[in-house]
Amino acid sequence: MPEKKGSADAKVLHCSFCNKSQHEVRKLIAGPSVFICDECIDLCNDIIREEAQATARAAIRSELPTPVEIKSFLDQYVIGQTGPKRMLAVAVYNHYKRIRHGEIKGDEVELSKSNIMLIGPTGSGKTLLAQTLARMLNVPFVMADATTLTEAGYVGEDVENIIQKLLQNCNYDVEKAQRAIIYIDEIDKISRKSDNPSITRDVSGEGVQQALLKLIEGTVASVPPQGGRKHPNQDFVQVDTTNILFIVGGAFDGLEKVIRDRTEKSGIGFSAAVRAKSERGVGELFGEAEPEDLIKFGLIPELVGRLPVVATLDELDEAALVQILTEPKNALIKQFQKLFAMESAELDIRPDALHAIARKALQRKTGARGLRSILESALLDTMYDLPTAGNIRRVVVDANVIEGDGKPLLIYADEVAGSDESAQGEVRDAAA
């Protein structure tokens, strides 16, 4: 019974669930003929939270895709880069297999984490590979820019801000965050400025590498709740980074020179062997990168050691850029055709225009990243007029449009209708 009478004939209310009286709890909330105390409410919240976390864990533990399936998924969105995709597929599969292994108690063999370093020119697909992996595995993903990071105590973001951003993406679900993928771009920009010690402090170089080292190898990071600032008298959210997969990427401009100096060493003086300078491309040289080259470039040995999987991406040529424009599921040409279709117009980009776009991107040295801006610029006037013109049914783009020597050919609705009628007339004449 929710109500009981005391000695003074006063009604004492009781919780309908645990039967504690109103004097034994802090708060008793009344409903239609029932009462619930604050302790029972807390217990219910804990049960709901545990069930939600168990559901999230079950989703993570669901059938893990094989390396072949991972690469096949990457092939749908990323053109070329077969070698790096195979390396990524194996590394990611082993990483999440390692997490499962860690959940088995009583096994003496402890598997170490295989974080990944992607080396490749600008616009070669480093960021896209990391994003696509996270989407396939249905795990939280956060991207950070290494150039904005500084040592703790200096103006700028410290490395724990990355974990804070990750928690925000996960709605502060710590269990989910601890199995995420973190991609740190421009890692080459925090290399040591020189091998010589300096009286000035390198707050965005070696110091940041040292701070990242702890995070990458696995530590318990303390993050202020709900994105607040750190101050001594507050509770922190504890996030263990041991099972977070870190992928770092960078263009590493100048690394090819370090590799060339190592691989093409020759003596000096009259007795030195005379060898012609090889004409190997940047991508080919990157493929020969060794840990010693990365250390000489400016990364600290400890950080290089924590990134055992090094995948080097090839420089994209004209043919690869044309494929990127047309073949992936979310190819740029398909995106623009969908935009034009929303205005009841068909966008026809001729093959010579595709090659012109690719050549322009190569000249600008922007890789795949520069393709959109070239296409946006070429179609700007057409997209400006299209919504108000109303009767444009087809837009044809050739190489002259891309090179700035012409304008897109616009075909209007009445022209389409006229051509259809003339075609029908020709059919009737032929039949007669």
Swiss-Prot record:
Residues 3-56 form the ClpX-type ZB domain. The keyword Zinc applies. GO terms for biological process: cell division; proteolysis involved in protein catabolic process. It comes from Bordetella avium (strain 197N). ATP binds at residues 121-128. The keyword ATP-binding applies. Transmembrane segments: none annotated. InterPro entries: AAA+_ATPase (IPR003593), ATP-dep_Clp_protease_ClpX (IPR050052), ATPase_AAA_core (IPR003959), Clp_ATPase_C (IPR019489), Clp_protease_ATP-bd_su_ClpX (IPR004487), ClpX_bact (IPR046425), P-loop_NTPase (IPR027417), Znf_CppX_C4 (IPR010603). This is ATP-dependent Clp protease ATP-binding subunit ClpX. Belongs to the ClpX chaperone family. Coiled coil: none annotated. ATP-dependent specificity component of the Clp protease. It directs the protease to specific substrates. Can perform chaperone functions in the absence of ClpP. GO terms for cellular component: HslUV protease complex. The lineage of its organism: Bacteria, Pseudomonadati, Pseudomonadota, Betaproteobacteria, Burkholderiales. Component of the ClpX-ClpP complex. Forms a hexameric ring that, in the presence of ATP, binds to fourteen ClpP subunits assembled into a disk-like structure with a central cavity, resembling the structure of eukaryotic proteasomes. One of its GO terms (molecular function) is ATP binding. Keywords: ATP-binding, Chaperone, Metal-binding, Nucleotide-binding, Zinc. It comes from the Bacteria. Zn(2+) binds at residues 15, 18, 37, 40.
